Each structure stands twice: as C-alpha cells, then as structure tokens.
C-alpha cells in the first residue's frame, strides 16, 4: 500500500530530480521502522551514465532542504537516496530502449491469441504495441493488455 504522503512527496521530488539531471524512479516511505525511512531511488537522465555516490549525495542534500521547507513529514525520519539497481521489470520508456534486444517475458490480461505469457527478444514499444522477436518472427502484442514485462534468462 502506498503511503498517503507519497504523491505529495513525489510531486516535490520529481521536478527537483529533473533539475539536477536525474529521473525519480521510485519513492517509498517505510513507516514500520523507527525512525521511519523515506527511500528515494534515482538514476541519471543520461542513459549512458550510471548512478554514482555523488549523484545520491547531491539529490539527498537538495531534497533535504525542500523537505525541511515544506515540512510534510511529521517527526523525525531518515532520508535515503540510492540507485534502484537492476530490476527485472521494465516500466519506463528508457527501460524499453536500454533493454532492446534482451530476452523478456510479457504477461497479458486478457490473453492475446490464447496466450497470457509470451517470451521473446524485445524489439520495442510504442503507444499501442510491445514488439517481440520470437525465433526471428515479429509479434506485436497490444500494449493495453500488457500487465508486466520482465527481463528473462531464457526464450522459448
């Protein structure tokens, strides 16, 4: 369940990240820890760069100033800024560009042509379709039915 403050916190952090040259990937507020932890995952807008310690530090310092200014989070908390690492789920436009040619598994609901799960090599994604290569044959899956696209180690 998403913490109720996350939408406000994201609307504060997203433009700040962009101004510094980063993409806000995810923000999670772990209130079951004492003190609570606000985890912010960023990555550079430049797809040829990896997230560095200096990137995390710059975002942390800038975000800390803004969070103190708006005072949305009551009490003490820990701000943790890091890289999302490598996730096997593809969600952003950038993911679909970076992982073009990689083996993926696509889950659909409703199924397409009687299949709910398709495996192949990613060719790309546009507004209407996710394109895969299945043993050299191009298949275009309806994007509206795609529930998840994950990196895979095998293709059938």
From Swiss-Prot:
Belongs to the RimP family. It comes from Synechococcus sp. (strain JA-2-3B'a(2-13)). This is Ribosome maturation factor RimP. InterPro entries: Ribosome_maturation_RimP, RimP_C, RimP_C_sf, RimP_N, RimP_N_sf. NCBIfam families: PRK00092.3-3. Its main location: cytoplasm. The keyword Oxidoreductase does not apply. One of its GO terms (biological process) is translation. GO terms for cellular component: cytosol. Gene3D superfamilies: RimP-like superfamily, N-terminal. HAMAP family: RimP. It is found in: Cytoplasm. Keywords: Cytoplasm, Ribosome biogenesis. Required for maturation of 30S ribosomal subunits.
């Amino acid at each position: 369940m998403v913490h109720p403050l996350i939408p406000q916190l994201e609307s504060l952090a997203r433009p700040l990240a962009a101004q510094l040259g980063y993409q806000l990937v995810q923000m999670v507020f772990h209130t079951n820890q004492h003190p609570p932890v606000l985890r912010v995952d960023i990555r550079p807008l430049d797809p040829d760069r990896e997230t560095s310690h200096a990137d995390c530090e710059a975002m942390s310092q800038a975000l800390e100033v803004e969070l103190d200014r708006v005072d949305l989070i009551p009490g003490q908390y820990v701000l943790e800024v890091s890289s999302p690492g490598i996730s096997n789920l593809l969600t952003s436009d950038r993911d679909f560009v970076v992982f073009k040619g990689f083996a993926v598994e696509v889950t659909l609901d409703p199924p397409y042509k009687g299949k709910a799960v398709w495996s192949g090599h990613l060719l790309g994604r546009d507004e209407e379709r996710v394109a895969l290569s299945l043993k050299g044959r191009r298949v275009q899956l309806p994007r509206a039915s795609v529930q998840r696209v994950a990196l895979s180690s095998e293709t059938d």
